Curated annotation (Swiss-Prot):
Family membership: Belongs to the universal ribosomal protein uS13 family.
Keyword Electron transport: no
BP-aspect Gene Ontology terms: translation
Name under which the protein is recorded: Small ribosomal subunit protein uS13
Any one GO molecular-function label of the UniProt entry: rRNA binding
Functional description taken from the UniProt entry: Located at the top of the head of the 30S subunit, it contacts several helices of the 16S rRNA. In the 70S ribosome it contacts the 23S rRNA (bridge B1a) and protein L5 of the 50S subunit (bridge B1b), connecting the 2 subunits; these bridges are implicated in subunit movement. Contacts the tRNAs in the A and P-sites.
SS bond partners: none
GO cellular component, one term: cytosol
Acetylation in keyword set: no
Amino acid sequence: MARIAGVDLPRNKRVEIGLTYIYGIGRSTSNKILKVTGIDPDTRVKDLTEAEIAKLREEVDKYQVEGDLRREIRANIKRLMDIGCYRGIRHRKNLPVRGQRTRTNARTRKGPKKTVGVRRAK
């Protein structure tokens, strides 16, 4: 079991895919890492040697991943909310931040519908 950046990589997957289980590493970053280390992307994680795993660890350590990345993202969002800019206000109100419409849709961000009752006139 290869453990890199505090994440156990799935044994039966290709290294290219296995690296994407690390938060902050996607397919393109994974391919860059493999190109630099000289490891074949089609190799299975279980077939990696200790030397190759050490190379991968060393290369992944150059990137900001897992807890550090999550912490930085959280700090950036908190900073936006503290300075009170438009994006910060949208984060605070749990609304879409990037200009999407909210008259309809935006249910993922807003949560389930809150039906407003209608008063009947007597």
